[in-house]
């Protein structure tokens, strides 16, 4: 009887941790989609700008700023139903 109870409680712990992982990854994906869709953060422009800036210092900052500005202007037009969370 004690062995069965132990196995049962171990099973509950495993299923509980699986559901926590699933909900965490779901919320992470949702926030990631929000950032990609809405350009809520200037990460893309800054990343590209920094890569270019590694080759041409100064130009990378300008390219990053331009990409962010273009993204902020075009995203509401191209994805009107997408909102930043």
From Swiss-Prot:
Pfam families according to UniProt: Coiled
Cited InterPro entries: HssA/B-related (IPR008455)
Superkingdom assignment: Eukaryota
PANTHER family: HSSA/B-LIKE PROTEIN 17-RELATED, HSSA_B-LIKE PROTEIN 17-RELATED
Stated family: Belongs to the hssA/B family.
Name this polypeptide is given: HssA/B-like protein 59
Organism: Dictyostelium discoideum (Social amoeba)
């Amino acid at each position: 009887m004690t062995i069965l109870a132990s196995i049962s409680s171990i099973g509950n712990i495993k299923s509980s941790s699986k559901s926590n992982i699933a909900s965490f990854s779901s919320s992470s994906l949702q926030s990631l989609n929000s950032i990609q869709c809405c350009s809520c953060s200037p990460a893309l422009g800054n990343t590209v700008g920094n890569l270019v800036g590694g080759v041409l210092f100064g130009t990378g900052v300008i390219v990053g700023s331009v990409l962010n500005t273009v993204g902020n202007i075009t995203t509401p037009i191209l994805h009107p139903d997408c909102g930043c969370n």
